[in-house]
Design a protein with these regions (language model features):
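ATP-binding/phosphotransfer module of carbohydrate and carboxylate kinases, centering on a glycine-rich
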Residues: 1-64, 68-143, 257, 261-394
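Short, acidic, Ser/Thr-enriched surface-loop or helix-capping motifs
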Residues: 101, 156, 225
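Glycine-rich phosphate-binding loop and adjoining helix at the ATP-binding site
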Residues: 109-210, 342-353
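Glycine/GP-enriched mid-protein hinge/lid loop-to-helix segment characteristic of carbohydrate kinases
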Residues: 109-111, 117-121, 170, 176, ...
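Short, active-site-adjacent cap segments at secondary-structure transitions
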Residues: 67, 153-157, 194-197, 221-222, ...
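Short glycine-aspartate micro-motif
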Residues: 85-89, 144-148, 211-215, 221-223
């Protein structure tokens, strides 16, 4: 037999195994016969792959299912507790880390808030969170299978953080540092791309194929899912729409541009606008998204107007995106999603100003995952990297 034939047979076998596992994961519990029907594989192939997956502790046998005639079939379950992933969202002033099982269920989480930290200081906080999550991890056949990290900046295809202006990071190889310390695969992803994937897999975007995810925190990032797939652009740098110009003669942004969208429609812009309007919390606490939300909830009309102003600017940028991509769904996530009550009306007003042809079958929704979309997205990347058969490595 030629080597190429052997290689191709090996690739097919690995592909079949991955297909069987994915089918069990999606339709659990499921019988061997139903796997064959779902995948089109013959029963012998299914039986062989199921045996391997059972030996590897990635699936389990449960009690018999309902019979359609003859013996009741043995049902198969995806073993979501075979291992665990860690997903981390590094923001400008916080780190959120979550521990998930292989199905994406959150088993533990840790949050650290900070202000104006250096890279080295943030790295130490990151180690603290990851160490704590690992310590809390239950015993399992595979233990920690991977770590995913979302960052607010451009990330190269090999995981180097090229530029994160709001963190003052440039050319940071965090992936190499993390893999050396924890000895597991580490994936670094733009936080908005990860958030878009998290919403598509677990949240408001489950039923949509063309999604614009707008991550609104200290800055603004955008993740694009087009025809069901995450779009990253030629070099992986798509989605930096927080830096599109909406005011030609506007103030200078950290990125070097003028009049960037995030200078007018982000959490930072909200707090800055409230400060300029002389708004002060009654308790004497510092101005923040939380304190402004509380004032708005208590009926402060001045604060509500500031929210509505930010919502209007948010709508301007979203309209530009709608006109370019014609999506079926726009999801607004990250920290400003908690202010939907004050942002929704001005957003709808701006939406009415976009091309009427683009408004048909379009929905604008707020995140169902709130601040967890990015962490869930990168944790899912880590789990799927472990579970997927990569033919490049065969």
């Amino acid at each position: 037999m030629k080597m190429s034939q052997t290689y191709n047979q090996h690739v097919v076998k690995k592909g079949n195994k991955s297909l069987v596992l994915q089918t069990i994961q999606e339709f659990t519990p499921i019988s061997r016969a139903d796997i064959a029907n779902q995948t089109g594989l013959n029963k012998g192939t299914v039986s062989s792959q199921v045996s391997e997956l059972l030996n590897e502790n990635l699936i389990l046998e449960s009690g018999p299912g309902v019979s359609s005639g003859g013996r009741r079939p043995v049902m198969l379950l995806f073993n979501h507790l075979a291992g665990y992933s860690i997903g981390v969202d590094i923001g400008v002033n916080y780190i959120l880390g979550i521990l998930t099982d292989l199905q994406g269920n959150i088993r533990n989480e840790k949050l650290i808030k900070f202000h104006d930290r250096t890279y080295e200081e943030i790295k130490d906080e990151l180690f603290t969170i990851v160490d704590s999550l690992i310590e809390s991890m239950p015993e399992s056949p595979y233990g920690l299978v991977g770590i995913g990290i979302g960052v607010p900046g451009t990330v190269s295809t090999d995981g180097e953080i090229l530029l994160a202006p709001n963190l003052n990071w440039k050319n940071i190889n965090l992936r190499k540092t993390m893999e050396a310390k924890y000895n597991v695969p580490v994936q670094i992803e733009n936080e908005a791309n990860a958030g878009a994937y998290g919403e598509k897999k677990f949240g408001a975007g489950k039923d949509s194929s063309n999604i614009i995810y707008v991550s609104v925190g200290i800055g603004i990032g955008v993740g694009l899912i087009l025809n069901g797939l995450l779009y990253k652009g030629n070099n992986g740098f798509s989605g930096e729409l927080g830096h599109m110009t909406i005011e030609v003669d506007g103030p200078e942004c950290r990125c070097g541009n003028q009049g960037c969208w995030e200078l007018y429609a982000s959490e930072k812009a909200l707090v800055q606008s409230a400060t300029e309007h002389g708004i002060k919390p009654e308790s004497g606490q510092a101005l923040s998204l939380e304190s402004l939300n509380e004032l708005a909830e208590n009926g402060d009309a001045h604060v509500i107007r500031v929210f509505e102003e930010i919502g209007g600017y948010l709508g301007i940028g979203i309209n530009n995106i709608i006109n370019i991509f014609n999506p079926e769904q726009v999801i607004i996530g990250n920290r400003l999603a908690s202010c939907s009550k004050w942002l929704e009306e001005p957003l709808k007003k701006k939406q009415g100003q976009t091309l009427f042809t683009h408004q048909k079958d379009l929905s604008i929704d707020f995140s169902q995952l709130s601040t967890h979309a990015t962490a869930l997205g990168v944790a899912a990347y880590a789990s799927e990297n472990f579970l997927t058969i990569d033919i490049q490595e065969v």
